């Protein structure tokens, strides 16, 4: 069952793990690591409720939201696109590449965006293309990360991280709230892209998703018939037993492929950052702190240490941009298809909508870069903070949808209901606190 959750890991590594949490660690030590692992734990349970809906119905979770109210079709179309239209990941990868070879950042970022679009467009079945690339890139990233950790990290630093993991509620004075809010969302895949887990397990053929068509390339793939409308299996002892197998396997796959890998990468990247740049070090502007980390590695191990670190970072950010374009386009295409039917009575082809969204996102990203918005950290923090607010909304919607819809063996257990309520309160609290902070009403 390996596959769908590895794509989410590739998404999560690319900003929260590599950029935001290491930066917060350099500024504040491990004082906020309790919030880090709490965020990724909540995302595990959120993602499993997304999977519950799709395993049982074959529909994506956003279609379930539209069943609650047609209002959620245009609302989530905005939520699934606006936070992700800023090309921070391609810009970040181009920034690191420019430190290695003499390549201007903006042309490099544009080339990266176009390369991602072409990669998604040429594979016959898009899911297989993305899964294969993400598995390889995640393996490369972890190999580089493990080598760095083994060479650098001391046991005492691990002890400091463990202590910070249990300082629940501790908030250092002066922490930049939008960055913390974004880091909470990106402790995991974050925001609306978690909803794409529905699409991944559909295309993988899990549960009732087996009966729904996949997204195929208009250039190299064979069109598959399908509908955004799913179906619930008939009640019988045999089907209930099959459901229990589906649910058990899905939980195991997501726990191993997403939760453990995301938590491990968060811990290792933060440990490496804390070892290279002691708490309280100057982080500078934008990606300056990553350059400082690379500089320390060059001093300790020579040029190869710097090259290994920056190559890992480029792989991290490129894999994230690729997976983001795919995930955002999947969720948006579902919502466009159902919106066209609900509001205009028009039928549409899901694959064509998907590729239309992919290339529209790329075109907008190019315009943003040409307009001079080429600071990757600013773009990442903006995207992350907006996505944390989106997570607040869909925590409540998933709770409403699944508790209302499922009974018997499919029902949501009390413990998971409690976790969804906790997620709603957690992301709601930090979103509200960030808003008040930006208005100057706290501090």
Predicted regions and their residues:
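Membrane-interface "cap" regions at the ends of multi-pass membrane proteins
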Residues: 1-16, 182, 209-214, 218-230, ...
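Flexible loop linkers connecting adjacent transmembrane helices
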Residues: 21-25, 48-72, 95-101, 124-129, ...
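Hydrophobic transmembrane alpha-helices that form the core helical bundles
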Residues: 56, 71-103, 109-113, 318-337, ...
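Loop-to-transmembrane helix boundary motifs in multi-pass membrane proteins
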Residues: 106-111, 304, 308, 336-371
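C-terminal membrane-solvent junction of multi-pass transporters and transport-like membrane proteins
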Residues: 129, 133-136, 330, 334, ...
């Amino acid at each position: 069952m390996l596959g769908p959750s590895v794509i989410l890991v590739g998404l999560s590594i690319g900003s929260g793990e590599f950029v935001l949490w290491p930066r917060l660690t350099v500024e504040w030590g491990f004082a906020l690591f309790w919030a880090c692992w709490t965020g990724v734990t909540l995302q595990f349970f959120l993602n499993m409720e997304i999977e519950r809906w799709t395993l049982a119905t074959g529909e994506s979770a956003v279609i379930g939201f539209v069943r609650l109210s047609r209002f959620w079709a245009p609302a989530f179309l905005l939520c699934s696109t606006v936070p992700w239209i800023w090309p921070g990941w391609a810009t970040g990868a181009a920034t690191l590449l420019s430190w290695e070879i003499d390549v201007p950042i903006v042309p490099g970022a544009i080339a990266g965006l176009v390369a991602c679009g072409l990669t998604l467009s040429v594979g016959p079945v898009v899911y297989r293309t993305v899964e294969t690339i993400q598995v390889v890139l995640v393996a490369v990233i972890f190999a580089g990360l493990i080598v760095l950790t083994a060479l650098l990290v001391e046991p005492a630093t691990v002890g400091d991280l463990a202590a910070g993991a249990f300082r629940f509620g501790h908030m250092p004075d002066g922490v930049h709230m939008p960055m913390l809010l974004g880091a909470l969302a990106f402790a995991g895949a974050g925001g609306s892209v978690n909803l794409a887990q529905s699409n991944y397990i559909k295309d993988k053929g899990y549960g009732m998703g087996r009966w729904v068509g996949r997204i195929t390339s208009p250039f190299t793939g064979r069109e598959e018939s399908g509908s955004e409308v799913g179906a619930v299996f008939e009640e019988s002892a045999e089907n209930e037993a099959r459901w229990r197998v589906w649910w058990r396997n899905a939980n195991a796959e997501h726990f191993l492929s997403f939760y453990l890998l995301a938590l491990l990468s968060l811990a290792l990247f933060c440990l490496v950052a804390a070892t290279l740049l002691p708490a309280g070090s100057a982080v500078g502007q934008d990606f300056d702190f990553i350059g400082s980390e690379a500089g320390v590695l060059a001093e300790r191990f020579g040029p190869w240490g710097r090259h290994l670190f920056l190559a890992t970072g480029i792989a991290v950010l490129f894999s994230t941009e690729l997976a983001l374009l795919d995930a955002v386009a999947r969720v948006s295409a579902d919502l466009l298809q159902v919106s066209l039917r609900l509001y205009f009575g028009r039928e549409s082809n899901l694959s064509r909508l998907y590729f239309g969204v992919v290339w529209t996102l790329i075109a907008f990203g190019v315009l943003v870069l040409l307009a001079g918005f080429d600071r990757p950290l600013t773009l990442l923090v903006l995207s992350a903070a907006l996505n944390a607010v989106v997570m607040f909304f869909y925590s409540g919607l998933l709770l409403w949808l699944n508790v209302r819809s499922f009974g018997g063996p499919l029902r949501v257990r009390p413990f998971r209901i409690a976790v969804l309520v906790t997620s709603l309160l957690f992301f709601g609290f930090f979103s509200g606190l960030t808003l008040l902070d930006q208005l100057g009403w706290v501090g």
